[in-house]
Each structure stands twice: as structure tokens, then as C-alpha cells.
Amino acid sequence: MAWLIMEEEEVDGIPVNEFGRLEIGFDYGFDFTGIVTPPVSTDYDVTLYAKLGLYCYNFQKGTNLKFVRWEKYNTSTGTAYIDNYITLEAMDPSCNSVFSFQTVFSAAGCYNQDTYHVQDWRVLACRPTCGKSVNEYFDRHEAMDPFYTGKMPKWLSDDALAFDNKKYYVVQESDLHENDWLLVFMEMVFLQEKSCVSSSDHKAIIRKTMDGVPEHMSLEIALVK
């Protein structure tokens, strides 16, 4: 398994429009029609979505919250998106306290670029359970450097991988133990590729961006054929 990761820091000053459809999920406490509780066949998927919500929160807040279990979720589907409203239990290792946490994780569409199949995943909310509204508007254009909104970068050539190690970093096993989010990113690639790629060797490019709105994050995952 190999992947390239691009990251962009938060950008301040983006315009915030009116809150929309996602406000409903929180106003009803995630308990409106269609509630799902474990165990279910999608348990693995929901667990990954919940962990990415926690990762986004930890990254933005500088915390180290850990996933305990997901409690319930429901789904809202549109023509170009699938939003998952997830309530989970999170733990703060510094005081061993367990508390309720909510995240909205969205499949925001996919497209083909050259030989890549790219899926756009988004975190649209991630916070300890509360009653505040959700800002669903994700601005990929005005708030971000154009370098991060254009085409996904190309996979490095064999020559570059062999002779130009300044362009990449080889992840060590110790890195995986110290940064569990790397494993979550890797699992998201496997989740995406299981229906797209049949080869046993997998390559992926991951681009993480943020639009400056608290609790927002985008992950674009390109499967390299």
C-alpha cells in the first residue's frame, strides 16, 4: 500500500451563508426517522466515518480524543451527496472521561481524472454533542489556494521514487503507532478501492483541505490504477 498526502492549513475569512439541511439532524438529536443502531452490516464504514470526525476535531483543537464506539446514525441522501449523522462515544485520555460526540460525514461526489478515480469525502461537523446549528456550506474556491482546488497531483514516477527522496517520506512502523490517523486514512483508501480496484497492489493520493470554517474538512482520495 502506498499513498501521497497533500495538506493545506485552515484559511480565515470565508463567507458563511445560511444554515441548511444539516441543521435538521442536530435539532432532532439525530433521532428522526431512519435511526440505525449497532450491530449492522455497515459497522466498519460508520466506525471509519466517526474516527475521521474525531481526527478533524483533534487536528483543529489540538486535542487527542479517542474513539470508543458509535451509538447511532442516520443518513440523508441528495442527488450529489450522502450525509451521515453519527453520534458516538469519545474518550479524553488525559482524564479518562467518556462523553457523547457528534459528527456529520458526507460523501460529496466522485469523478474521473485521467486514469484516477477520485472520491470527495467531507466532515461538515465534529464536536461534543450540543444543540448548535451546522454550517453545511463548504467553499472550495474562494477560501483556498488554487493549487489545492485544481487537478489531483500525479503519482511520482519510478525514477523519482528511486532517486529523489526529497519529494516523499517513507512511513515507518513507529509513525503508524504514534499517528493513528495514518491508519484511518489508509483504511479509507481500502474502503473506497474495494469496489473499484481488483489488484492486490494499491496506490492512492490523498489531498486534505479545509475552508476555514471550524469543524470542516475535505479528503479527496484518488485511486491510482
UniProtKB/Swiss-Prot annotation:
Protein name (record): UPF0725 protein At5g63820
Domain of life where this protein originates: Eukaryota
Organism expressing this protein natively: Arabidopsis thaliana (Mouse-ear cress)
Pfam families membership: protein_MS5
Family named by the database record: Belongs to the UPF0725 (EMB2204) family.
